[in-house]
Amino acid sequence: SHGGKDLAHAIQRLNDLGYRCDLFTLDAKWFVPQSRVRLFVVGSLDSLPVAGWPNADLRPAWLRAFVDRHPNLLVQTLPLPPLEPSQATLKDYVQRLPPSDKRWWDKQRLEIFLTSLSPIQSQRLLRLQAQSELSWATAYRRTRNGRATWEIRADAISGCLRTPRGGSSKQALVEAGDGRVRVRWMTA
């Protein structure tokens, strides 16, 4: 936050205590079907083996740029193994509800959802609907030009949605296939 000033300050404080730091990110999608990127700062009192900047998944370009902008910080990189994304998708975890379950949106709410989709989102939904098997995707509401619209994720994972005030935003779950579509709020 604050253009990297908070991170630079935290690393400098760790450096002042004698720690060298490694920085890397982990995304939950490497373990479960959810995208949730987190930054890790690992401090060591011992000198770390220098690994350069391998594995762009763990150390994206923005992280390298941060380190380049702060040459005074003691940052060294650990040799971390590459991570393979999880093969799990929403279908492996989604709670199966019968069509009669009250949590599915009624026709009126479904129609509002469908009419709020952009042409690209409508095409995405039509492709899912045309499949012979049921599939699941998450959708989230955004405001575009003062109008609420729904966007359906193209992958089979859920996102980590944050509101401008720092809280979480709810996701909808789209179930489509065999010519049908149903939508409801995501459940545990």
Locations of the language-model features?
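Short Ser/Thr-interspersed hydrophobic loop/turn segments at strand-loop and sheet-helix junctions
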Residues: 160-166
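Cytochrome P450 core scaffold surrounding the K-helix E-X-X-R motif
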Residues: 170-174
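Acidic glycine-/aspartate-rich tracts in secreted/extracellular proteins
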Residues: 48, 166-167
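Low-complexity, glycine/alanine/valine/leucine- and proline-rich hydrophobic stretches
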Residues: 175-188
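Class I S-adenosyl-L-methionine
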Residues: 1-153
